[in-house]
Amino acid sequence: SPYRPEVYADQIKDAKPGFEIMQGVNINVTNDIEKGLIPIKQNLALYIGGMGAKSKNFHTDLMARMGFEAEAHQIQDLFLEGRRNEAIAAVPSQFADEISLVGPIERVRDRLDAWRDSPITSLMVSAGSREQLQQVAELVLD
């Protein structure tokens, strides 16, 4: 997240000049932000809930370090109990929104500034369609 530099500041404090920092970001250009966050939440529930052992899951730990500890453990518990739809519903919209670029193109453009102002040097973009990828490319390349 470009909004929580304290989460990764220690890991990059000794980076050499020119060190590249890449981050994946999902993009969904839509007028319905909540609906646009659904695929993001589905993906997050899988990673937070099911990637790794219950006692050691990088994604659960990262979400906790980002200030969503109770939610991270709830998602993991629900997912591991086979209650995947409930795990998806337990992903906070605030969290999903903070680590993605979802909404009308104007909102996506405005929120790109937070990434530009962060230590991230390159975004690895995933979009739902070629058209959305083209829209975002035009924003970035302007």
Language-model-detected regions and their locations in the chain:
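Active-site-adjacent structural elements that line small-molecule/cofactor binding pockets in enzymes
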Residues: S1-D142
